[in-house]
Amino acid sequence: MASTTSRSARPARRNNKAAGSTTPLLWLAFALLVVLLDQFFKIVIVRSFTYGESRPVTGFFNLVLVYNKGAAFSFLADAGGWQRWFFTGLGVVVGAFIVWLLYRHTGQRLFCFAVSLILGGAVGNVVDRVIYGHVIDFLDFYVGRYHWPAFNVADCAITVGAVLLIVDELRRVRKH
């Protein structure tokens, strides 16, 4: 007796990815793009400016070349040198955690976009710490005589990514 089982009767393979999900490699490529943009602008500034030089662009914005041995707002900048490796190690650990998150949350596009920005920014600043021993900052916004601490493209990416994480979480909470 011939077998009555045909190929069409076999269950179809299921795709484990959620509808609308993307590959983590896409988000890693995006993070790499952030790193490349950050490093490109830092190289341009380092080649075009002397340390401490400031060039006005508008009435509230200068390009400037400054170094930051600490973290945001020069936190721990005068700590004696150990902070270079502390912040480098922290950036590597955060980067590894974000890569893990990207593989765990492929169906959450806004979340993946946000953490990719944070990853790119973290890696951009880690590159500076490893190569130069400090982070290169060059964006200087001010009002009158008050200057916001100088920052860079990597810092912008981290900030935008953090804001988008908050937006993503608020959207998720609102759905439930």
UniProtKB/Swiss-Prot annotation:
One GO biological process term is: proteolysis
Topology versus the membrane? Multi-pass membrane protein
Tell me the route in metabolism or biology where this protein functions: Protein modification; lipoprotein biosynthesis (signal peptide cleavage)
Give TM segment ranges.
Answer: 26-46, 57-77, 82-102, 111-131, 147-167
What single Pfam family name could you report for this chain, choosing any that match?
Peptidase_A8
- Annotated InterPro entries: Peptidase_A8
Catalytic activity reads:
Release of signal peptides from bacterial membrane prolipoproteins. Hydrolyzes -Xaa-Yaa-Zaa-|-(S,diacylglyceryl)Cys-, in which Xaa is hydrophobic (preferably Leu), and Yaa (Ala or Ser) and Zaa (Gly or Ala) have small, neutral side chains
Q: Which GO terms describe its cellular component?
A: plasma membrane
Presence of the UniProt keyword Cell inner membrane in the record:
yes
Where does the protein end up?
Answer: Cell inner membrane
**Active site (record annotation):** D137, D155
**What keywords were assigned to this record?**
Aspartyl protease, Cell inner membrane, Cell membrane, Hydrolase, Membrane, Protease, Transmembrane, Transmembrane helix
- Predominant subcellular localization, coarse grouping: membrane
From which domain of life does this come? Bacteria
Q: One GO molecular function term?
A: aspartic-type endopeptidase activity
EC number(s)? 3.4.23.36
Disulfide bonding pattern of the chain: none
Give the family this protein belongs to, as stated in its UniProt record. Belongs to the peptidase A8 family.
Q: What does this protein do?
A: This protein specifically catalyzes the removal of signal peptides from prolipoproteins.
Q: Which PANTHER family match?
A: LIPOPROTEIN SIGNAL PEPTIDASE (PTHR33695:SF1)
Task: Tell me the protein's name.
Answer: Lipoprotein signal peptidase
Natural source organism:
Cupriavidus taiwanensis (strain DSM 17343 / BCRC 17206 / CCUG 44338 / CIP 107171 / LMG 19424 / R1) (Ralstonia taiwanensis (strain LMG 19424))
